[in-house]
Amino acid sequence: MIDVIIAGGGPTGLMLAGELRLHGVRTVVLEKEPTPNQHSRSRGLHARSIEVMDQRGLLERFLAHGEQFRVGGFFAGLAAEWPADLDTAHSYVLAIPQVVTERLLTEHATELGAEIRRGCEVAGLDQDADGVTAELADGTRLRARYLVGCDGGRSTVRRLLGVDFPGEPTRVETLLADVRIDVPVETLTAVVAEVRKTQLRFGAVPAGDGFFRLIVPAQGLSADRAAPTLDELKRCLHATAGTDFGVHSPRWLSRFGDATRLAERYRTGRVLLAGDAAHIHPPTGGQGLNLGIQDAFNLGWKLAAAIGGWAPPDLLDSYHDERHPVAAEVLDNTRAQMTLLSLDPGPRAVRRLMAELVEFPDVNRHLIEKITAIAVRYDLGDGHDLVGRRLRDIPLTEGRLYERMRGGRGLLLDRTGRLSVSGWSDRVDHLADPGAALDVPAALLRPDGHVAWVGEDQDDLLAHLPRWFGAAT
């Protein structure tokens, strides 16, 4: 029997497949599209996702296909410098098209043995105490121990579960288009600069091969959220910029709204939700793909532990407990950003005030930490300030921390050399390293790099190990 069915082969599902296969979990990804995605809605990775790629040994692949930027302005386009003191070894944004991210994650998952079936869509599901039966659109049935819905904002899995998806409806729509233009680039650049003095939901950037990615406010709401036509794009360009730049030969046309919705629960028995199936929000700040990757990084090791038989009773539930509040905060900050992009007098007055505030380094850093997810700290109870945070990559006597965590296991980083994980050594590595660049005597790290315990007392460590790594063997 399959261990895990993943419905959806986008970045979240592919990341999760790699995480599960790292632990030997038999994984099948079902993707309804018959061929790989050729268009990139998202175009970058933030620091936390870059850390994830480093921790899994994938970063060099991504760096080879992306470009590093240290530029501010990610919060509602407010002009700001990139902070110099972010708590990460990867203090930059990696510009990389989503289509490349998906290709690299596909390569990683399949190298580890994940099976990806295209042209397959979940149409029904039934679960019992032992597993989940998924019915595909062609009538085929598959049985697995767990199923994870990574099938996007219009998730079939979420609908079949009957999970509520409360939130705010779309009030404004924006068109995205990769097109060619019939005017000089200098003309396009000049018009964009002039229009953006008042309309910040308008923009144009090179998209490769002579194409430009245009971002244009829609004129009203669509009835069915269907992709716009070239004629609609031209009308919206005329309404916003007074010209359509002679756009032609579109290779991609899409639209997005400013709706924000959050699934009421991420787990229903043996079925879980991740990525856009669990939360949707506007793309302001470029957080959506990154949020899904981090969902997968949180869930993967926990699901593997449940399948491996060593998961503590509440470990799978901690996925919802930890990731649901993170998504709620992202929904809040994207709502705030959309408000700051409004043309109405009230929001524009607030924007002018915010433009003054981001000149303060602490305010600027706070906003960037939100966008990049560096500020995320899971509520793991009382204790040292490090508990619940992801530990940045640090130098060790030999090598780096993230290099030591590429196997997806827990790690006791012990500067004292006096501690032991005997009884958990099949799940937790012990590195006694007095030269580690760590400001505490010892730290217990979960497989996702978050600090579960800090201290130097063996009895206290033994009291905390079972919470995340189950009973001793």
From Swiss-Prot:
Give a yes or no for keyword Zinc in this entry. Answer: no
Q: Which Pfam families match?
A: FAD_binding_3, Rng_hyd_C
Positions contributing to rifampicin binding = R43, R196, G285
Enzyme Commission numbers on file: 1.14.13.211
- Disulfide bridge positions per record: none
Q: Which cofactor does it need?
A: FAD
User: Which family, according to UniProt?
Assistant: Belongs to the rifampicin monooxygenase family.
Fill in the subunit field for this protein: Homodimer.
What is this protein's function per UniProt? Monooxygenase that can modify rifampicin, thereby inactivating its antibiotic activity. It constitutes a secondary rifampicin resistance factor.
Name the UniProt record assigns to this protein:
Rifampicin monooxygenase
* Provenance organism: Nocardia farcinica (strain IFM 10152)
